[in-house]
Regions:
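Short, well-ordered coil/turn residues at beta-beta hairpins
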Residues: 3-4
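FMN-binding flavodoxin-like domain, especially the glycine-rich phosphate-binding loop
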Residues: 7-136
């Protein structure tokens, strides 16, 4: 299982470097790719959720697998975390208007400055399905 959060429409640097470094080895193994991102809760009020999810799946999962010659047995797309405490000043300032949108979408602030859109049960179920595929 290889995964990443999506930050500014990209995989994190560490995850991308891992894929690049082990590309050859991973291409010969059963792999599963997943991302955690905001596609399920787009912050643009005009955005269509299904369109955002399809874009994220194609761009961050299918295209990523193709780039590294992977044939994943599963692709997972999950909600992400908005942690304003770990953002740089400019990024935090830019996204400060997002907080009311998150709350309006029913996403509570779980800790000061932290909004978590992940569904832990969905992630667990996906991981169990992947495990079963690997074992078969």
């Amino acid at each position: 299982m290889i995964g990443s959060g999506i930050k500014i429409k990209k995989w994190t640097k560490e995850a991308e470097q891992f894929l690049k470094k082990f590309q050859k080895e991973l291409a010969e193994k059963k792999t599963a790719l997943f991302i955690c991102c905001g596609a399920k809760y787009p912050l643009d009020g005009k955005a269509d959720v299904e369109t955002e999810i399809e874009y994220a799946r194609k761009t961050h999962l299918e295209d990523k697998a193709a780039k590294y010659n992977l044939q994943p047995i599963a692709l997972g797309l999950f909600g992400g975390v908005y942690n304003f405490n770990k953002m740089g000043w400019l990024f935090r300032k830019t996204l400060s208007a997002v907080k009311p949108q998150l709350e309006a979408a029913g996403i509570p602030e779980t800790e000061p400055g932290l909004y978590d859109t992940r569904d832990v049960n969905s992630i667990r179920n996906w991981a169990k399905e992947v495990t079963q595929k690997v074992q078969s």
